[in-house]
Amino acid sequence: MSELEAIEIETAPSPSASIIWMHGLGADGHDFVDIVPELHLPARPGVRFVFPHAPMRPVTINGGYVMRAWYDIRDADGVRREDPAGVRASQKSIEALIQREKERGVLAASIVIAGFSQGGAMALQTSLRYGERLAGVMALSCSLPLADTLAAEAAPANRDVPIFMAHGTHDPMIPMARAVRARETLVGLGYRVEWHEYRMPHSVSPEEIRDVSAWLATVLTLARSS
């Protein structure tokens, strides 16, 4: 398994926290780089943002066109014919990024796993099955992959990890109903989900960025004091 290439931004020298942030289908690691200064995070702890590039692969729903994708999408609802092998391969690649951050001196408990759309789905997939406690999970405009396996595969270490989920009420790509179903599944399994809705399509909004900023500041502060 080759290591994912990634863009990195450090908010201060020798960061003691990391945010691994996955992009959506067809985008790349540059997609959310410009959001870093908009988050206005506290000067301490210093944070290393890691924006990995998904592998290039053919995507069935797009006529087999090769693009950056964390897994294949085989039908419009993304549920009936999931791509378990693709999801799990990307999970392992993201786990390798977590391991790399740990090797650079960042505790698992100071690492946030985040993502948008497919990237948000992978944030949930990876974090909730990860064997060490993480700082938090941020899942924006996404659904829950391999939902039927989560109860059996959930890691006890992250049963109470803070989860931030947000979705646009006018999202034509991933309908609100799918996101609500994901939230209900998580809540039904006992997870703590902070839920936000915004009047927007499949995108981010200034209001959402403010809420993300506040949530990140909280979980990173908690991680620093633990």
Regions found by a protein language model. Give the residues of each.
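Serine-hydrolase catalytic machinery in alpha/beta-hydrolase-like enzymes
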Residues: S2-V112
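Short alpha-helix in the alpha/beta-hydrolase fold that links the catalytic acid
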Residues: F32-P37, A151, P175-T185
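Short, conserved loop/helix-junction motifs that constitute active-site signature segments
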Residues: L41-R44, A154-D160
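Alpha/beta-hydrolase-fold catalytic nucleophile elbow
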Residues: P52-H53, A114, M138-S141, A166, ...
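Primarily recognizes the serine-hydrolase "nucleophile elbow" in alpha/beta-hydrolase
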Residues: K102, L107-N158
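Short, proline-enriched alpha-helix->beta-strand connector loops that line the catalytic pocket
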Residues: N158-I163, L189-Y191
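Short beta-strand/loop motif that positions the catalytic acidic residue
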Residues: F164-H167, D171
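C-terminal catalytic histidine-bearing segment of alpha/beta-hydrolase fold enzymes
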Residues: A177-S226
